[in-house]
Amino acid sequence: MEELQGYLEEYRSRQQQFLYPLLFQEYIYVFAYDHGLNSSIFYEPQNSLGYDNKFSSVLVKRLIIRMYQKNYLIYSVNDIYQNIFVGHNNYFYFHFFSQILSEGFAVIVEIPFSLQLISSLEEKEIPKSHNLQSSHSIFPFLEDKLLHLNYLSDILIPYPAHMEILVQMLQSWIQDALSLHLLQFLLHEYYNWNSLIIPNKSIYVFSKDNKRLFCFLYNLYIYEYEFLLVFPCKQSSFLRLISSGVLLERIHFYVKIEHLGVCRIFCQKTLWIFKDPFIHYIRYQGKSILGSRGTHFLMKKWKYHLVHFWQYYFHFWSQPYRIDTKKLSNYSFYFLGYFSSVQMNSSMVRNQMLENSFLMDTLTKKLDTRIPIIPLIRSLSKAQFCTVSGYPISKPIWTDLADCDIINRFGRICRKLSHYHSGSSKKQSLYRMKYILRLSCARTLARKHKSSARSFLQRLSSGLLEEFFTEEEQVISLIFPKRTSFYLYGSYRERIWYLDIIRINDLVNSLLVTT
């Protein structure tokens, strides 16, 4: 218990007490909408986060002037409630001001965490490039480690039961009471207007208007969750700082936990003390995986440990159904857009010893990764590229564009999805997806010119093929120019993992959420 409290005091020693006055500075809102801190390693471009990049210095100055008025926010909310059907102009100003205020608040509360991460990286002399890892880098790790494990726990991280829990977590880091009261006000009002939280969804489902604030709150929550999970392990302390300090929900990390012992938790309940030399932990968004080489009884103790942490630290009711433990040899788990499983491959080897020969059956383990075709088709259907059954259709909203723009858009989507799913063990699902997008492109062009899709396929066959040519096929065609046609007809089965994927395509991300 004393060791855990020491860790908490060490990491929370740099609390900020005077953040609220920064809300009255105009440059804070410039940072929020222009990402003036772009030179640091914490931020992605705005188009990656979904911002519409709308900013008005006049409205920001007007907001700052009005905030100097006593109880301005309370009067504004009451006025909106009284004139909800007639005060459209007042509602617009309140919604716009509250959105700007939430973005500025998110920038301010990120400052202590950003400074802490920079100092930790400088102390450890860690290059910044190591902080941004590709999501595909997880799969070679799985190929190397999962083959030697016995059990796997599929964990769905519960979202906070009440927003006040998030405020209490932030209070342990920031001692500025005014900022905390402002956060409570924003959460309360946005919750009433159903603009901050989407009902019946996990917390990582953000609204478009408050994505930055929700990113911060969600990562703060994950910060505490992962700290309670791996605090006795020295190897995890560096990864903990990275995963929470970056404050953007594209972060995922994996770590091997050696000899992890569970001591005493805040509820003063003593758990079993156990050690496991082979524990692996991986997380993306609200889903995490815990693998072990131990026994099923050991995994049950892990489940007991996590459920009680949730119950006593985050004030949840007992939720054991969120942890599903299976034997790895009989289990297929879904993670990062792939269905993965460990398959046993049998091969017969003939051995010759003097005049005697005999056959030996050799078993080898291999990680099999496949694309979930049904959820992927469902995702394409929601984007209006095909029907629910996978039948390609035209996209009427794009018929006003030029032909080259239509082809480029379809080709870009196809290349991005193929780029991400290039690690599939079997390519049939990938080829079916490319076929849907290619035929949908032809039908969109045919609808624009009031012609048939067949005529456009015949007229633009070479152009469409080149536009839908994936990157890995281009590389293969350069390395093996004489065997290109052999690979393009579906016989190429090698998996390719890319180390430059730091953001998942929107269609793929919707697939991860809906599955």
From Swiss-Prot:
Keywords: Chloroplast, mRNA processing, Plastid, RNA-binding, tRNA processing. One of its GO terms (molecular function) is RNA binding. Its main location: plastid. Belongs to the intron maturase 2 family. MatK subfamily. This is Maturase K. One of its GO terms (cellular component) is chloroplast. HAMAP family: MatK. The keyword Cell membrane does not apply. One of its GO terms (biological process) is tRNA processing. It is found in: Plastid, Chloroplast. Usually encoded in the trnK tRNA gene intron. Probably assists in splicing its own and other chloroplast group II introns. It comes from the Eukaryota.
